[in-house]
């Protein structure tokens, strides 16, 4: 179980380790944005933006919906909070006994 959880965290951080995806998150931190705005602001082609959005959606970091026929991206603050704060850095959620630690 812990190996699967560690792999999931590793993949989550891989998704975040891309400059363009971080820029997308910075834009969404202030307000929801439609795809056209993001393409223009970040100087991306539609296919490039879609690929990055799909990676972020894979881990529910963002979600999309149509508003008045326009596709809009939204930051999922709850998921980010769970991954970045509550889960990893909360000693009550994970215990050291479940990991093999190297002795120095």
What would you call each of these model-derived segments?
Residues 7-48, 66-80:
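N-terminal helix-turn-helix DNA-binding core of bacterial DNA-binding proteins
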């Amino acid at each position: 179980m812990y190996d699967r959880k560690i792999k999931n965290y590793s993949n989550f951080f891989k998704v975040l380790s891309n400059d363009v995806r971080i820029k997308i998150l910075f834009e969404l931190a202030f307000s929801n944005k439609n795809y056209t705005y993001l393409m223009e602001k970040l100087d991306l082609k539609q296919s490039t933006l879609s690929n990055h959005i799909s990676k972020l959606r894979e881990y529910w970091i963002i979600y999309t919906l149509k508003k008045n026929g326009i596709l809009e991206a939204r930051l999922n603050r709850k998921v980010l909070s769970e991954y970045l704060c509550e889960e990893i850095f909360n000693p009550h959620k994970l215990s050291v006994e479940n990991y093999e630690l190297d002795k120095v």
